[in-house]
UniProtKB/Swiss-Prot annotation:
Heme b 2 binds at residues 86, 187. The keyword Methyltransferase does not apply. Its cofactor is heme b; heme c. It comes from Nicotiana sylvestris (Wood tobacco). Component of the cytochrome b6-f complex, which mediates electron transfer between photosystem II (PSII) and photosystem I (PSI), cyclic electron flow around PSI, and state transitions. This is Cytochrome b6. One of its GO terms (molecular function) is oxidoreductase activity. Disulfide bonds: none annotated. Belongs to the cytochrome b family. PetB subfamily. The gene is petB. Heme c binds at residue 35. Pfam families: Cytochrome_B. GO terms for biological process: photosynthesis; respiratory electron transport chain.
Length: 215
């Protein structure tokens, strides 16, 4: 085992990376409220794991979506637990994200030189809200259907581009299979990918610039 570690250490300098991570200075004013971003990340990872597990059973069609969710909840092994954890962690992620934004704002974390960190954080907050909107529709029950109809109908009030934008979101003039397919693709591929990209931008900047000062 030691030889295997030495082989990787010689090529990747694992110990130097570990020392850099563990030796980072933590200001004395840091408290539990500075952990809200990390908790949000943890919730996101739980979402990825549980969401991936549900893709084995979920069917993104208007005729089978609701039945597949019922199958997950009643027949799939531990399906009820996986979906429940997914829902609970989704609510927790949104709550922690909101509290994290407030904490950063109150402590001046958006000021120079952390402007870009703040911008990427705001984008991540928007992506988090988008997860909620798209995920809410996937069971394709009455609540999900009408929520999608209302949300996708909002841009219709915008002059000139409103109607084309509604059709782009829905995939057609009315809510249906094209809408569910779009929302499923957004929820399971586009949004997770964008979130991962912006997280990979967000965290190195925090690492480089450090934590903002106290109130």
């Amino acid at each position: 085992m030691s030889k295997v570690y030495d082989w990787f250490e010689e090529r990747l300098e694992i110990q130097a990376i570990a020392d850099d991570i563990t030796s980072k200075y933590v200001p004395p004013h840091v408290n539990i409220f500075y952990c809200l971003g990390g908790i949000t990340l943890t919730c996101f990872l739980v979402q990825v794991a549980t969401g991936f597990a549900m893709t084995f059973y979920y069917r993104p069609t208007v005729t089978e979506a609701f039945a597949s969710v019922q199958y997950i909840m009643t027949e799939a092994n531990f399906g009820w637990l996986i979906r429940s954890v997914h829902r609970w962690s989704a609510s927790m992620m949104v709550l922690m994200m909101i509290l994290h934004v407030f904490r950063v704002y109150l402590t001046g974390g958006f000021k120079k030189p952390r402007e870009l960190t703040w911008v990427t954080g705001v984008v991540l907050a928007v992506l988090t809200a988008s997860f909620g909107v798209t995920g809410y529709s996937l069971p394709w029950d009455q609540v999900g259907y009408w929520a999608v109809k209302i949300v996708t109908g909002v841009p219709d009030a915008i002059p000139v581009i409103g109607s084309p934008l509604v059709e782009l979101l829905r995939g057609s003039a009315s809510v249906g299979q094209s809408t569910l397919t779009r929302f499923y693709s957004l929820h399971t591929f586009v949004l997770p990918l964008l979130t991962a990209v912006f997280m990979l931008m967000h965290f190195p900047m925090i690492r480089k610039q450090g934590i903002s000062g106290p109130l």
